[in-house]
UniProtKB/Swiss-Prot annotation:
BP terms from Gene Ontology: methylglyoxal catabolic process to D-lactate via S-lactoyl-glutathione
InterPro entries recorded: Clx_II_MBL, Glyoxalase_II_hydrolase, HAGH_C, Hydroxyacylglutathione_Hdrlase, Metallo-B-lactamas, RibonucZ/Hydroxyglut_hydro
Record-linked HAMAP family: Glyoxalase_2
Pathway entry: Secondary metabolite metabolism; methylglyoxal degradation; (R)-lactate from methylglyoxal: step 2/2
Protein name: Hydroxyacylglutathione hydrolase
Cofactor note: Binds 2 Zn(2+) ions per subunit.
Main function: Thiolesterase that catalyzes the hydrolysis of S-D-lactoyl-glutathione to form glutathione and D-lactic acid.
Family in the record: Belongs to the metallo-beta-lactamase superfamily. Glyoxalase II family.
SUPFAM superfamilies, per database record: Metallo-hydrolase/oxidoreductase (SSF56281)
Annotated binding of Zn(2+) 1, by residue: H58, H60, H116, D135
Listed EC numbers: 3.1.2.6
Domain of life assignment: Bacteria
Length: 251
């Protein structure tokens, strides 16, 4: 029997995911970062779901592009970062660090995780140990720092590392295969200051290959595994993080 509360992934564009939290008991749903409305509406209607809320992590168009159409179709509230009021005028409620949000059966705590953007937030669900992290962290990688500093990017990852090891991270891009190639470049460099668990990385690579061959997502990520293989989580200080991020930017 299907779980009462679960997360479904709706692929959009080339490598984005929209996350649809679904409550089987009430047929209510919550959408996280719907960059495109059409596939989300199709999924909701096919599964006879009513959209109860939209959660946004940051203002980039591939995360908010479908909000207006979805809000008009389902008349649901939109939650967004307080620091992005100008960029996301369609939102109804503005969120900051430590705020609590209840949507249907789900309770979330808001975490401000700047770096990728200055106003970036994530949504933490304690009950299921779910983190909806936007573009802060990816499988074996992290988001580019378009607005924030290296210090902010590093500290945001340190905050994620403090979550329970069983945390499931729902990041919104399928970048894991590309990031694996970067990890292997690091492994083959004699002078790299960051090395992870090579055996764990190969197990990770095998699992990733198996999933992608079946057209299955690499998301959600398991925090306990990312901590042993993700070079950006293994960085011991801001300077190591800067080294990695600048190297990755050149790839």
């Amino acid at each position: 029997m299907a779980k009462k509360e679960h997360v479904e992934l709706v692929p959009i564009f080339d490598d984005n995911y929209v996350f649809i939290l679904t409550d089987d008991a009430t047929q209510k749903a919550v959408a996280v970062d719907p960059g495109d409305a059409g596939p989300v509406i199709d999924f909701l209607r096919a599964n006879k779901l009513d959209l109860a809320a939209i959660l946004l992590t940051h203002h980039h168009s591939d995360h908010i592009g479908g909000v207006g159409e979805l809000k008009a179709a389902f008349d649901c509230p939109v939650y967004a970062p307080q620091k992005n009021q100008k960029q996301i005028p369609v939102a109804d409620q503005w969120l900051k660090e430590g705020d609590s949000v209840t949507c249907g059966p789900w309770d979330f705590t808001v975490m401000e995780l700047p770096g990728h953007t200055l106003g970036h937030i994530a949504y933490w669900n304690q009950k299921h140990k779910w983190l909806f992290s936007g573009d802060v962290i990816f499988g074996l990688g992290c988001g580019r720092l378009f607005e924030g500093t290296f210090e902010q990017g590093y500290e945001s990852l340190q905050r994620i590392k403090k979550l329970p090891p069983q945390t499931l991270i729902y990041c919104t891009h399928e970048y894991t295969k590309s990031n694996l190639e970067f990890c292997r470049i690091l492994t083959n460099q004699d002078n790299t200051p960051i090395t992870g668990d090579s055996e764990a990385l190969e197990l990770y690579a095998n699992e990733l290959s198996n999933r992608r061959e079946l057209n299955l997502p690499s998301v959600p990520l398991k925090l306990s595994i990312e901590e042993s293989v993700n070079p950006f989580l293994l960085a011991r200080d801001v300077e190591q993080f800067r080294y990695l991020r600048e190297l990755r930017n050149r790839q």
